[in-house]
Amino acid sequence: MINIPKGTKDVLPSESYKWHYVERIARETADLYCLNEIRTPTFEHTELFLRGVGDTTDIVNKEMYTFRDKGDRSITLKPEGTSGVARSFIENGLFNGAMPLKMYYITPVFRYENPQKGRLREHHQFGVEVYGGAGADTDAEVIKLAYTVLKKCGLSVKLYINSMGCPDCRKKYNEALKGYFADKLDKLCPTCRERYYKN
């Protein structure tokens, strides 16, 4: 008998109604916020994720399902939804249309993680991307949409809002952080040391 691959799960008829319920709430809420659905391929060229996610992240270094296809191209099962949407936005010239362009997706994503209870290698992600919307009002709208979806699903939600700051502030913060760790590198794990030098 052939068993299901490690880190995956069958959605059986006895529980698929729960998936339909959550997906319906996500879609209906996205519709209320005037978002249109976008569907991108389940796999993309690996280079897209190296650029989009960053070559120093755990996703790229440890968690991607990457393989060579019959044409010897490096292909990756998408580990997240944003990169494929950004590629589609550029490749299909969506920037030439009316702005802001607000899109959502519900898609499977894949991460090569250590499977544990509640942690699988195939996930399903609901995501929102807004192009051409500037300022905090766009961020607030996306946060409100996510909050609404979670509340409609019956979850108790408490929001804590933070900011990465402006590019100047981030640069100063990174410099201060690197300064703090400069004399502690021997105490860091190999991955953290690598990030110290790459970031």
Language model regions located:
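Extended, charged alpha-beta segments that form solvent-exposed binding/catalytic grooves
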Residues: 1-199
